[in-house]
Structures are given as structure tokens and as C-alpha cells.
Amino acid sequence: MLGAYLPIIVLVVVAVLFGCGSLIFSSLIGQKKPSVVKMAPYECGCEPVGSARERFSIKFYIIAMLFILFDIEAVFLYPWAVLFKRLGMFGLMEMGVFIVILFVGYIYVWKKGALEWE
């Protein structure tokens, strides 16, 4: 039983050792000459302007959650499409109900104005 997982365990151990070894090796032989310029925050070659603690509009989060919600349907549609012939009419009706529920949710979100960007 353990023999089946041995290659994966060896791969994980080698990857962890390589990562840790690289970090330790670079910290030992790397140059350590900190300066004000090197320690300053860097953003795309420009001097940072303003605070990094700005608030985002809640609309970004709402759109992100709606995207995730309606994108997850693909996770359920793909296995159904693969097994469509084996599921037959029962699978078709179940997926029809699923799509109708998603469509009703989409209409609800649309009517509430969550997709409006003002």
C-alpha cells in the first residue's frame, strides 16, 4: 500500500529539500548591502503614491462572488456532458431543472441591479 505512494512522497521530499536548500544557499552566499533605495517599496518602477490601505468598492466583491457563483455551474455541467448518453432522459431533466434554477437566480440578480455598474 505504501509502495504505491512512495514516488509521490519522494517527489515531495525532494521538492521541499530543493526549495529550502535554494533559500539557505542564496542567503549564505548572497550580498547583503541594504540601502534606503533597496528597502523602499517598489511598484512597477514608480514611486508609491498614497496608502496601500485604501478601501475597495463593495461592487468589486459582489461581482466577484456572482462570477464564482455562476462559473461554478461549469463544474457541474462538464461531468453531465461527459455522461450525457448514460444518464438518458433522467439526466437531461435534472440538468434542465438545474439550468432553470440558475436562470431564475440570474434574473433575480439582474432585477436587483447587482450587475449595474454605476
From Swiss-Prot:
Chief subcellular site?
membrane
Instruction: Write down the membrane topology.
Output: Multi-pass membrane protein
Transmembrane stretches in the record are 5-25, 62-82, 87-107
Q: Which family does it belong to?
A: Belongs to the complex I subunit 3 family.
* Main function: NDH-1 shuttles electrons from NADH, via FMN and iron-sulfur (Fe-S) centers, to quinones in the respiratory chain. The immediate electron acceptor for the enzyme in this species is believed to be ubiquinone. Couples the redox reaction to proton translocation (for every two electrons transferred, four hydrogen ions are translocated across the cytoplasmic membrane), and thus conserves the redox energy in a proton gradient.
| Cellular compartments annotated | Cell inner membrane
Q: Which GO terms describe its molecular function?
A: NADH dehydrogenase (ubiquinone) activity; NADH:ubiquinone reductase (non-electrogenic) activity; quinone binding
Q: To which species is this protein native?
A: Geotalea uraniireducens (strain Rf4)
| Originating gene | nuoA2
Pfam families hit by this protein:
Oxidored_q4
Provide the Gene Ontology terms for cellular component. Answer: NADH dehydrogenase complex; plasma membrane
Describe the subunit structure: NDH-1 is composed of 14 different subunits. Subunits NuoA, H, J, K, L, M, N constitute the membrane sector of the complex.
Protein name in the entry: NADH-quinone oxidoreductase subunit A 2
Write out the entry's keywords from A to Z.
Cell inner membrane, Cell membrane, Membrane, NAD, Quinone, Translocase, Transmembrane, Transmembrane helix, Transport, Ubiquinone
Enzyme superclass (EC): translocase
- UniProt cross-references to Gene3D superfamilies, sorted A to Z: NADH:ubiquinone/plastoquinone oxidoreductase, chain 3
Q: Which reaction does it catalyse?
A: a quinone + NADH + 5 H(+)(in) = a quinol + NAD(+) + 4 H(+)(out)
EC code(s) of this entry: 7.1.1.-
InterPro entries recorded for this chain?
NAD(P)H_OxRDtase_bac/plastid, NADH_UbQ/plastoQ_OxRdtase_su3, NDAH_ubi_oxred_su3_sf
Organism's domain of life?
Bacteria
